């Protein structure tokens, strides 16, 4: 994937369009502890993409296959 550099500034609409077109994943992990005792642990994975982009990549890794329904 090539990185394109431009000298002009981008508008907010262009940035949002690019994020939805390419997609972005934010992976976060937070741990709060006091005196060595873990009080809170949070793990989050946030995916921002258009439906078309998500389906394209989800199909590539097999996430769009429907599960068999028991009879």
UniProtKB/Swiss-Prot annotation:
Keywords: Gas vesicle. It is found in: Gas vesicle shell. Residues 23-32 are annotated as: Beta-strand 1. Residues 12-22 are annotated as: Alpha helix 1. Induction: Gas vesicles are abundant in low light, and collapse after exposure to high light. Signal peptide: none annotated. The gas vesicle shell is 2 nm thick and consists of a single layer of this protein. It forms helical ribs nearly perpendicular to the long axis of the vesicle. Belongs to the gas vesicle GvpA family. PANTHER family: GAS VESICLE PROTEIN A1, GAS VESICLE STRUCTURAL PROTEIN 2-RELATED. NCBIfam families: PRK09371.1. Solid state NMR studies suggest the protein has an alpha-helix beta-strand beta-strand alpha-helix structure. The beta-strands are thought to make an extended cross-beta structure which forms the hydrophobic core of the GV. This is Gas vesicle protein A. It comes from Dolichospermum flosaquae.
């Amino acid at each position: 994937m090539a990185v394109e550099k431009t000298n002009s500034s981008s508008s907010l609409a262009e940035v949002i369009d690019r994020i939805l077109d390419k997609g972005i994943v934010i992976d976060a992990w937070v741990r709060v502890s006091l005196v060595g005792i873990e009080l809170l642990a949070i793990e989050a994975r946030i995916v921002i993409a258009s439906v078309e982009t998500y389906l394209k990549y989800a199909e590539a890794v097999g996430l769009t296959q429907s599960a068999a329904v028991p009879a």
